[in-house]
Design a protein with these regions (language model features):
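Cys/His-rich zinc-coordinating "finger/knuckle" motifs
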Residues: 34
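Alpha-helical cap/lid subdomain in secreted, periplasmic
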Residues: 6, 91, 110-245
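Conserved Rossmann-like nucleotide-binding pocket used by diverse enzymes
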Residues: 23, 96, 163
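Generic structural signal for helix capping and beta-alpha/helix-loop junctions
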Residues: 69, 103-105, 172, 206
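Sec-dependent bacterial lipoprotein signal peptides
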Residues: 1-25
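Bacterial signal peptide processing site
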Residues: 27-31
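Serine-esterase "nucleophile elbow" of acetyl-processing enzymes
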Residues: 37-101, 113-122
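Subtilisin-like peptidase catalytic core
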Residues: 99-108, 131
Length: 245
């Protein structure tokens, strides 16, 4: 019998909250998550920090509504907050936000090459944050794995490093589904030598102080906490630059 660590129990509990909230929000609907209302969640705007001196680092943040900044004002998204923290740490980083609300891994796969080809240059790193809508719609883990694999294969072909911000399915979706889904991200991270943050909403989901009213998306304070955890990992995942001659 597999021994479930306290950390894994905590992540399962958090994932359960996410799915329960998402299913309530999506009850009797099959359409994509709607566009945010004009009045977004109140909260502190991510401060705009000028790019520091040093070599430019281009990062693509490719994901769903958690990257897109659903329900937040412009400049309050997770990629915005990570960019700010990187610049505060002395990294001349620019993050292109390619988050689209409602995207499943299949929808992301369809637009992935287009997103890469329309960047100003080859990115130094690609963050991929998909899977939440796959869980909410209970898409088969094999399909999710195939879509994620295709995107990572594309990055491998282009010699672009990846970082995965993972998603987890809760136990109430069934032991087989949960097992097959939750192993996708660590498996792929190991196979493609990608940096892995196992569950993007860890430490945020379930805390009403950090979540919007829908209980699915973080508010600005939740974004700040996520970025605080992710930014050092993103910095470490950036490839080492060759010394200038």
């Amino acid at each position: 019998m597999e021994i479930i660590t306290l950390q894994r129990k905590r992540l399962y509990a958090a994932a359960t909250v996410l799915v329960q909230a998402g299913l309530l929000a999506a009850c009797d609907r099959t359409a994509e998550i709607p566009t945010p209302a004009p009045t977004a969640t109140a909260g502190p705007t991510v401060p705009q920090v000028a790019a520091p001196k040093g070599p430019s680092r281009l990062i693509l943040a490719f994901g769903d509504s958690l990257y897109a900044g659903y329900g937040l004002d412009r400049g309050q998204s997770i990629p915005d907050a990570i960019q700010t923290r990187l610049r505060q740490a002395g990294v001349n980083a620019t993050i292109v936000n390619a988050g689209v609300s409602g995207d499943t891994s299949a929808a992301g796969r369809q637009r992935f090459v287009f997103a890469l080809d329309n960047l100003p240059r080859k990115p130094d790193l690609v963050l991929i944050g998909l899977g939440g809508n796959d869980v909410l719609r209970q898409i088969g883990p094999a399909e999710t794995r195939a879509n994620m694999t295709a995107m990572l294969d594309e990055l491998k072909t282009r010699n672009i490093p990846a970082m995965l911000t993972g998603m987890m399915a809760p136990p109430n979706l069934g032991a087989d589904y949960t097992r097959d889904f939750n192993v996708i991200w660590p498996d792929l991270a190991s196979r493609y030598h990608a940096t892995l943050y196992p569950f993007i909403l860890d430490g945020v989901i379930g805390d009403t102080r950090l979540m919007q009213a829908d209980r699915v998306h973080p508010n600005p304070d939740g974004v700040a906490k996520i970025a605080e955890r992710l930014a050092p990992m993103v910095k470490a995942a950036l490839p080492t630059l060759a010394p200038s001659s």
